[in-house]
Amino acid sequence: MNVTLLIPARYGSSRFPGKPLAPINGKPMIQHVYERASLAKGLTNIYVATDDERIKSAVEGFGGKVVMTSPDAASGTDRINDAINQLGLKDDDLVINLQGDQPLIDPTSIEQVISLFERHPGEFEMATLGYEIVNKAELDDPMHVKMVFDNDYYALYFSRARIPFGRDTKDYPVYKHLGVYAYTRRFVQAFAALPLGRLEDLEKLEQLRALEHGHKIKVAISAFDSIEVDTPEDIRKCEQRLAVD
């Protein structure tokens, strides 16, 4: 199975401009993401998908591969769709979408979503990752997206609010979403053509578009947390984690 991993990266960010190039222990964040991804087994190719020449230069500087995408991409999926069209992938080729703000992603987590497609061919259109929240401060932080899934590990909903809500107890597991997606080229194109969902627009969570239109998202539970970098403070958290790893 041909498996292409794409890392969408944009320079502009309202909370953290230039985030992909922010240094973490002397290397740009995008390099950490790329190098972590390259340790995952089963990948055919890895590319950074960007519309910014500064990011392109940085990636090529450490030996990475880049696909230049349109600056008009309205979402991460649109950027992924643009990239796979340029790469000429086949309809059944697997695409891994690894968010560019995941410098500490564990390679085995990437392998988990690949394995879901290998073990359950044709049973779902999309796969992603969850992690049981340990840090209680994340429970009510809208920057940490929560998720619920059924007994067969199919996603039921994603939210910036704490879900599920325990009416009579606070002692229960809550899972957060990790920014890794897997889908076929065929589904990426179909997904990009779907209209914006009402819930997607409310929560500002693109994956809800798939659920709103009746598509199935399979979930793998990772044993490893991954810090998502949204602010400069998160850079310091990454450096602290790397110091003890």
Curated annotation (Swiss-Prot):
It catalyses: 8-amino-3,8-dideoxy-alpha-D-manno-octulosonate + CTP = CMP-8-amino-3,8-dideoxy-alpha-D-manno-oct-2-ulosonate + diphosphate. Pfam families: CTP_transf_3. Keywords: Cytoplasm, Lipopolysaccharide biosynthesis, Nucleotidyltransferase, Transferase. It comes from the Bacteria. Belongs to the KdsB family. Activates KDO8N (a required 8-carbon sugar) for incorporation into bacterial lipopolysaccharide in the Shewanella genus. This is 8-amino-3,8-dideoxy-manno-octulosonate cytidylyltransferase. It comes from Shewanella sp. (strain ANA-3).
